[in-house]
């Protein structure tokens, strides 16, 4: 699949369950999306893993620590969407000071100023991004976190030519950096952090040849 096809399949898959799931944080239910359950992080994890074989992390704490931070201006809690792409994830503060940046919720950008996510009740739901972000910004949190506004936008599907796992592994193997290509292909498909490290390694090598 091309980068655009990957982004579209993630969005289409997520939207296929619009208002069809009950909210649950139960570990036995939260990732059973096609069985009618889910929560915010379980929903986005499920589709990335099922459709692309990418393990972006099963909860917001894991997810915010993976992927690449997108360079977006945030004004009054609302991101400038000109640098955003379908499938990007928006992370919001909750009420737990112990988590990375107090992260407590995640939504998926689906294009045209809209986002999709499963917060509570029946979901997931499509929302106008600017309205939702302003609403979160206005919600109080702990004294340390102040509000439940947007923390950052993260990307897991890149839009340059170096996106295919097979291409990355082939180049690393060709240069004698890794052996057992099949094993590395599987590792990079399952581990987003390993994927990004390998990708950065190849990019660095190319730039310094």
Regions found by a protein language model. Give the residues of each.
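Short, solvent-exposed alpha-helical surface patches in non-cytosolic proteins
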Residues: 40-46, 162-209
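N-terminal capping segments
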Residues: 1-61, 85, 93-96, 100-105, ...
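Low-complexity, Gly/Ser/Thr/Pro-rich intrinsically disordered linker/tail segments
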Residues: 141-162
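Short, structured beta-strand/loop micro-motifs enriched in basic residues and often containing a Trp
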Residues: 64-75
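Catalytic Cys-His active-site segments of thiol-dependent hydrolases/isopeptidases
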Residues: 56-60, 106-136
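Conserved beta-strand and immediately adjacent loop positions that scaffold enzyme active sites
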Residues: 105-106, 169
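Short, well-ordered loop/turn sites that connect or cap secondary structure elements
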Residues: 78, 83-84
């Amino acid at each position: 699949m091309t980068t655009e096809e990957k982004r579209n399949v993630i969005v289409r898959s997520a939207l296929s369950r619009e208002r069809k799931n009950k909210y649950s944080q139960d570990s036995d239910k939260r990732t059973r999306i096609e069985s009618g359950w889910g929560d915010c992080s379980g929903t986005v994890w499920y589709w990335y893993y099922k459709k692309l074989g990418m393990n972006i992390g099963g909860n917001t704490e894991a997810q915010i620590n993976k992927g690449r931070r997108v360079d977006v201006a945030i004004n009054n809690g609302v991101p400038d969407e000109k640098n955003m792409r379908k499938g990007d994830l928006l992370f919001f503060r909750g009420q737990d000071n112990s988590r990375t940046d107090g992260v407590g919720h995640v939504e998926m950008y689906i294009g045209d100023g809209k986002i999709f996510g499963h917060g509570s009740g029946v979901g997931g739901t499509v929302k106008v991004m600017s309205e939702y972000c302003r609403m979160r910004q206005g919600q109080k949190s702990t004294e340390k976190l102040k509000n439940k506004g947007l923390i950052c936008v993260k990307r897991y599907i890149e839009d340059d030519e170096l996106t295919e796992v097979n291409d990355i592994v082939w180049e690393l193997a060709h240069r004698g950096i890794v052996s057992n290509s099949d094993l590395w292909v599987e590792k990079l498909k399952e581990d987003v952090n390993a994927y990004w490290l390998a990708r950065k390694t190849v990019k660095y090598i190319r730039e310094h040849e």
